[in-house]
Amino acid sequence: MKIGLASYECRMNDIGFNLKQIEKAIVESKDADLVCFGEAFLQGFAAVTSDYEMDIKMAVEQDSLPVAKIRELSLQYRKAVMVWYIEKDGPDIYSSYALIEGGSVIHNYRRISKNWKDYNITNGNYREGTDTSPFLFHGVEMTVALCGDLWIYPESFRCSGLLIWPVYVNFDLDESESGEYAKQAAMACGKALLVNPLSKEPISRGGAFFFENGKVKQSLGLDKEGVLVVEV
């Protein structure tokens, strides 16, 4: 299976632009079977204000129009897509990462660490998930960790197959820094794919990496849009 790690620009609270970027990346991913995007992609990293009345309006449900558009794209281009979104489920809000294939959401991971919002002021409707179980996709055992999850609870993501690690990093992922991420990923899984979006506000320089046994095996440069295709 070939997996494309799409490091593309996303904009805060501009879902229309971000959906166009998703389609652009899918087209440019060529023969990838699955295209993965970084944390904060659909609504933008700073979209969460920790003001419940604002955030519940910003969040989207699995059957919302934006998610329906991504489902349509997965059908149109015959590719699976993994994308981060702020999810609304009834009165509750989650930081989630959906796997979409064939027009359906087939897996929906909810971040388990709490530092995606200002937890000192948010109410009980800002929720974390509890399920970190691996799942099978095209015969490959996979698990998903969202950004800080893997730094706080690495033992919860142990997997014999492949770790998908979408992040939002606002500092340089240079050789030294990416090496630290590779070592951290190895605490959970021998093979890991990290993808970081590009953003002007707040700043994120992008980049994508394939880690194996704590080492960087493949990478995509910073400050430019592109898709790193990895065969697993």
Give names to the regions the model predicted.
Residues R78-W84, R111-N120, A192-V195:
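Short Pro/Gly-enriched beta-strand edge/turn motifs at strand-loop
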Residues M1-L5:
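Extreme N-terminal starter segment of soluble prokaryotic enzymes
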Residues I15-A25:
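Short amphipathic alpha-helical segment that frequently serves as the phosphate-/nucleotide-binding helix
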Residues K88-G161, E175-S178, L222:
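Active-site catalytic loop in hydrolytic enzyme cores
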Residues K24-G102, F171-M187:
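Cys-nucleophile CN-hydrolase/nitrilase-fold catalytic domain and related Cys-dependent amidase chemistry
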Residues S7-N13:
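Short polar catalytic/cofactor-binding loops
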Residues A59-A80, W151-V227:
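CN hydrolase (nitrilase-like) catalytic-core segments centered on the catalytic cysteine
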Residues V81-Y85, S95-L99, S133, G206-F210, ...:
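Short beta-strand scaffold segments in enzyme catalytic cores
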